[in-house]
């Protein structure tokens, strides 16, 4: 079961201008509301697609392995999100799923962030157990599909709400951080995948001079 999401640690959206909430631990919480149908960016088709697709594939091949398959999106809103699948191997005994397309457009990073331009583009990834069921048929079951759903949902999130996602941001599954599918997880935490992959993998410098940061999507309990 997947709910509308809100972000902790992200900039406020254009549709929500209230003062942010502060948790007892000092974290900032921003809530995002649906926009009117006329202004809803979800109704916009991508103006550009697959800007860095080839460079991302080359980056994955260089530092991890060549993707075994790409789950191509048929119908896209805002940005075209594909998911690259690297199957388990001796070096990496787990499934690796990585987005491409989130970085097609820059995110709206707050001006107070130092070197903000280096955080404007990102892609997301998740690592799954070797016995995880992956495939078009298997994804008909939400218990198998939810990691891919959240990769794609979060990849669109900053573009939909004119905000950004980055290091340490947490995104709950709805206002109450409800359980996701058949798990006890209720939130997603974004961190650089530095424990699983080479440090040089964490950042891709594109041919046009931009920087794409890779963040691991880590499910956490409420």
Regions found by a protein language model. Name each.
Residues 2-222:
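Short linear motifs embedded in intrinsically disordered, proline/glycine-rich low-complexity segments
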């Amino acid at each position: 079961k997947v709910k509308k999401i809100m972000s902790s640690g992200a900039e406020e959206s254009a549709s929500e201008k209230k003062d942010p909430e502060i948790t007892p631990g000092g974290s900032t919480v921003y809530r995002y509301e649906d926009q009117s149908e006329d202004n809803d960016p979800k109704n916009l088709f991508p103006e550009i697609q697959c800007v860095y697709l080839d460079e991302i594939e080359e980056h994955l091949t260089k530092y991890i392995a060549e993707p075994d398959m790409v789950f191509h999106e048929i119908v896209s809103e805002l940005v075209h999100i594909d998911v690259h699948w690297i199957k388990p191997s001796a070096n990496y005994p787990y499934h690796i799923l990585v987005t491409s397309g989130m970085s097609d457009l820059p995110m709206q990073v707050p001006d107070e962030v130092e070197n903000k331009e280096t955080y404007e583009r990102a892609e997301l990834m998740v690592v799954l157990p070797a016995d995880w069921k992956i495939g078009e048929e298997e994804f008909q079951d939400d218990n198998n599909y939810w990691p891919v759903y959240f990769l794609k949902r979060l990849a669109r999130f900053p573009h939909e709400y004119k905000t950004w996602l980055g290091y340490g941001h947490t995104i709950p599954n709805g206002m109450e951080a409800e359980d996701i599918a058949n798990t006890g997880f209720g939130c997603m935490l974004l961190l650089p995948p530095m424990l699983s992959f080479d440090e040089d993998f964490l950042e891709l410098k594109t041919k046009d001079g931009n920087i794409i940061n890779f963040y691991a999507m880590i499910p956490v309990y409420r």
